Regions:
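N-terminal assembly/attachment segments of tailed bacteriophage virion structural proteins
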Residues: 6-145
Length: 145
């Protein structure tokens, strides 16, 4: 039982970083430059929005709190120009979560600048209303060896 509990605890551990995204006019600026290295994965970036004064369900201001039941998705543009979208996920604790997965960093062609654009929804499903924030970027760098 102890080994099973220990394995479960280890599996739930993660590498994470909190970042504030400040929205001004048509520009989104992260609180710091984002980069990782080839082969890095299992990293959760948690983004907090600042100065984005829209409301979800006409009750909650995104600058201070995201409504329970709000969702987000993210469109990703890879260094080679390919674009894909991640499935919508619930917004928890006012944070947008983006996970660096192995498929983003496991190949030489993955090195370079990625662009992320988050879409916020007032609910789940195809009838949910949507607002999009300006894109931000991060870089995958090469290892020394």
């Amino acid at each position: 039982l102890y080994i099973m509990r220990l394995r479960k605890e280890c599996k739930e551990m993660a590498i994470s970083k909190n970042i504030t995204i400040t929205i001004r006019s048509t520009k989104a600026t992260p609180s710091e430059k984002l980069f990782i290295y080839q082969g890095d994965f299992g990293i959760d970036f948690y983004f907090k929005l600042n100065e984005f004064n829209y409301s979800i369900k006409n009750t909650i201001n995104l600058a201070s709190n995201l409504d329970e039941g709000a969702y987000a998705s993210v469109t990703v543009q890879c260094p080679n120009g390919d674009i894909f979208e991640r499935d919508p996920f619930p917004i928890e604790n006012d944070l947008l979560k983006f996970t660096i997965t192995k498929d983003l960093t496991d190949d030489l062609s993955d090195i370079g600048k990625y662009t992320l654009q988050f879409h916020l929804y007032d609910g789940e499903g195809s009838d949910a209303n949507r607002i999009t924030i300006p894109p931000i970027s991060f870089e995958v760098r090469t290892l020394l060896i």
